[in-house]
Amino acid sequence: MIKAILIVFLSGCCFAASAQNDSSFLFLKKINGSFTSFEVDNLDNIYLINTTNQLKKINANGDSAGVFNDIKRFGPVTQIDVTNPLKILLYYKNFSTIVVLDRFLNIRNTINLRRQNIFAVNSIATSYDNNIWLYDEQEYKLKKIDDDGTVLLESNDFRQVFDSIPSATQLTDRNNFVYLYDTAKGFYSFDYYGSFKNRLPFLHWANIAVAEKIIYGFSYGKLLSYQLQSLNQKEYSLPAFAKNYMAVKIMNGKLYILKPDGISIYQVK
């Protein structure tokens, strides 16, 4: 079972206070460099794409744990999924191709979605059983494929389910559900057979992650959370030093802030 990719120290008023107090964030370290994007897995490994289009893995001790220099083999990479640290997914939308890397960032295999007549996919996600979810925006179906690209299951045609069809900004497999997020329509949740379960109309979120019974995201300089059981929605202003970021994530109790000169990492007290 894939572990949670996000463990945030967020417990009511405790985090609310910390969101208003910069001293509640302990500076740990900074990784200097010019990076365009990054991801963090559940083992605190950081995956960096620099301005020379190199993907580099830095482990929790700050040591280099892998380098992938062929990141632009299929053009600009659309998405990096590090849900499973042993199986890294690189998705190239322009070529409908998924490159699968091992934990050392060596190529394991390449999946050409076009061979399965899948031509329009905006987002992918590692599934609970180590396969791959995708939303086929041409057939309007949620599909699960294996490492050979074989379709293992698919949902009903969304045109038969929804009056207004969603487009996947992000997919996430967590808590026995698959979450499809459309920035203009909100969250759609499905069971592992592709059956629609629920919709949450939270719009314009970014850097979304789903932890134990909580959905997190960022929007307009704020951290947002939604409790799936209590249905409570909260928002917290980011501290002053987090302003004007290129990207921001809270993973494993740490705040990661990407700016033009590098990534700063803070422990949430």
Regions found by a protein language model. Give the residues of each.
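Conserved beta-strand positions in repeat-built beta-propeller and related beta-rich domains
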Residues: 48-51, 88-94, 101, 132-138, ...
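Repeated scaffold domains used in trafficking and secretory/extracellular systems
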Residues: 33-39, 75-80, 118-125, 163-171, ...
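A short beta-strand motif characteristic of beta-propeller blades
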Residues: 23-31, 63-70, 107-114, 150-163, ...
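Short loop/turn segments that connect beta-strands within beta-propeller blades
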Residues: 59-63, 102-106, 146-149, 191-195, ...
